[in-house]
């Protein structure tokens, strides 16, 4: 796929999302007393099973898997993971089997993302932990890879950190470059960008892009899992 991004031009991508997504002003919120102008990056319009910013990462991650000749990919996250749902959708589109190791008991209600995972054809299995940093997770991934290997499937693993983290952050560098073009087109220079921070990849990628492009815009991540003293070094490492 060819896009306008220059900072990651040497990395392979496969088209999965509808980009660029719009940057829209929120007129009523911006009109509130004491409020500066507020703009919203419409990642809800990215396509691919309402995947938000996940298709951006998957364009790079699935391209890497395809370059290796992968017939299957495996990833792991919470039972209602948006990333897992988007990965299942990407696999369905590209004809690649998707194995999901979801944290939980297996007794979770079949609704939301879990239902969509199954409708999209993913191989859903559960692992007995709720902690994304559980040291047993790599072993469970290895077990699933071994199972797929016995079935004759060449398998690629999507799991932080390592190459998955590097490519995921690179995808968000592209987002930062896309936003910089939109700032220029709108004639604005935002003081800060606020976003949720889970893995830290989006914060890392945006901050790296803005710094590289010489933008003064701060990137403020609101952690959804861990405290700041855990997240900050993680984000720095992934940048």
Predicted regions: what they are:
Residues 1-239:
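PLP-dependent amino-acid enzyme catalytic core
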């Amino acid at each position: 796929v060819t896009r306008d991004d220059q900072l990651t031009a040497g990395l392979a991508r496969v088209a999965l999302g509808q980009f660029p997504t719009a940057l829209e002003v929120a007129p009523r919120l911006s009109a509130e007393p004491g409020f500066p102008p507020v703009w919203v990056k419409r990642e809800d319009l990215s396509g691919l099973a309402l995947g938000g910013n996940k298709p951006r990462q998957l364009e790079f991650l699935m391209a890497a898997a395809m370059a290796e000749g992968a017939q299957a990919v495996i990833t792991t996250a919470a039972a209602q993971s948006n990333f897992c749902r988007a990965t299942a959708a990407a696999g369905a589109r590209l004809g690649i089997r998707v194995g999901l190791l979801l944290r939980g008991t297996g007794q979770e209600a079949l609704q939301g993302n879990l239902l969509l995972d199954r409708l999209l054809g993913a191989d859903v299995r559960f692992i007995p932990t709720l902690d994304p940093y559980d040291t047993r997770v790599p072993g469970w991934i290895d077990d699933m890879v071994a199972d797929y290997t016995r079935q004759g499937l060449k398998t690629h693993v999507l799991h932080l950190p390592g190459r998955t983290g590097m490519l995921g952050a690179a995808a968000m560098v592209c987002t930062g470059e896309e936003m910089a073009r939109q700032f220029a087109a709108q004639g604005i220079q935002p003081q800060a960008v606020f976003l949720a921070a889970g893995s830290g990849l989006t914060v890392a990628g945006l901050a790296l892009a803005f710094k590289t492009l010489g933008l003064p815009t701060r990137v403020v991540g609101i952690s959804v899992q861990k405290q700041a003293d855990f997240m900050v070094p993680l984000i720095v490492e992934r940048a």
